[in-house]
């Protein structure tokens, strides 16, 4: 059958590119000419078997969508090790491979910077205070979650605003302005920090899940509006989420101060900043493979994870 022949051709291509004996045995015994491959693929497409072609081809041949708008994103993650000694075959993907290298370096340096205070001179201090796991997880989640939302929303806003530069300017300006306002307002809620964090993190999670499901439709509805109106609408759409996202970091730092754990300040800032860098590298890696909305869903899960870690952070010293 054409499908069976196509499986053999795809397998031969994989052996040629990544098989253990590809250099010694270039002959596969299978007709690998472009004409034959074209006829087999065309036959499968006419028969409605697109999934067979997508799954069997050497590279990812799925059509581009607004969720995964990456023209050069044709390399599957499990296949990356197979191409390490044949990089000329995937020259368009070198930037993607550099992302993985950057991720490795950022995680390593982030962990080193996070552990340095515990190694040099602060052992006694860390032994005296409770809530250390909460400090680590809480501020790590805030760093990764915030940058996940920021970068994913930039990609979403491009659909409405039609320009990457404008999207970045509007999104970053709105996030910083509204989050700053949220941080300022959070001072009033520090005495009820536990209840406030429950409400804030739960609300952020629900908003992110809503945006992941419906943001594309909402932005599509305003696509024909005047450009100024679209900018105002995008800012208004961002306002409730960004305002709430300004609360957790400020309340976390204020809680440390109320518990007389000011020595954790530098550590918390460092963890938050280091893993913001890690998150900024993770976003394109995840969105290439799983889609931009998946990044927003992951951000929702991360903010929900920050909730129990805040309870541990609140533990008073014995």
Protein language model annotation of sequence segments:
Residues 1-318:
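Alpha-helical transmembrane segments of multi-pass membrane proteins
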